[in-house]
A protein has these predicted regions:
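An alpha-helical, amphipathic repeat domain used for nucleic-acid recognition
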Residues: 1-156
Length: 156
C-alpha cells in the first residue's frame, strides 16, 4: 500500500530495480523497502529475481560497504563486521572484504585519528587522555590491542 493503495508485483519489481540501481543494496535493505511499500507477497520471488539479474550481489555490496565505511567514516574492522552481520550478510563475504583493507592504510588511519583526538582533548593527565583516545577508537570499531599499542607508541 503506497499512499493508501496496494501495488502489484510488476510495480514492486520496477521500484526495486530502480532502488537497487541507485546504490548498492543487500537483501536486508530490499526486504525493508518491500515492507515500506507494504508489499508482503512473493518477497522471495522478487529477491530471487533481483539476485538473478544482478541487482543484488551480496559480495559486491559487502566489498563496497566495507570500503566506504573505512575510507569515509573511518570505521574499524569490528564495527564494519558488526553492521554487516546486522544486515544478515554471510560471514564469508564479511571476512573476505575486511581482509581487503590494506594493513598499512588501516594503521595510518588509526594514527591520524589518535593525532586528531589528542589535539582535541584538553585533559592534562596523560592516563586520562590516553583512556579517552582509546574509548574513541573503540567506538569507531578498532581492535583494543592495536589501539593501545599505537597509543603507547605515539605517547613516547
Amino acid at each position: 500500500m503506497q499512499n493508501g493503495r496496494f501495488i502489484n508485483y510488476e510495480t514492486a519489481i520496477k521500484k526495486l530495480e530502480k532502488y537497487c540501481s541507485i546504490q548498492e543494496r543487500c537483501r536486508h535493505d530490499v526486504i525493508i523497502k518491500l515492507k515500506k511499500l507494504n508489499f508482503f507477497k512473493k518477497n522471495d520471488q522478487i529477491i530471487n529475481y533481483l539476485v538473478s539479474n544482478n541487482f543484488i550481489n551480496e559480495e559486491r555490496f559487502t566489498l563496497l560497504y566495507c570500503n566506504g565505511k573505512f575510507s569515509i567514516k573511518k570505521w574499524g574492522r569490528i564495527k564494519i563486521s558488526y553492521h554487516l552481520k546486522q544486515k544478515g550478510i554471510d560471514n564469508i563475504y564479511i571476512l573476505k572484504s575486511i581482509k581487503k583493507i590494506p594493513e598499512k592504510k588501516y594503521i595510518e588511519t588509526m594514527i591520524d585519528l589518535i593525532t586528531k583526538k589528542t589535539k582535541a582533548i584538553k585533559e592534562q593527565d596523560s592516563y586520562k587522555k590516553n583512556c579517552a583516545i582509546a574509548r574513541y577508537l573503540m567506538q569507531k570499531g578498532f581492535e583494543t590491542d592495536l589501539i593501545w599499542k599505537l597509543i603507547n607508541k605515539n605517547s613516547k
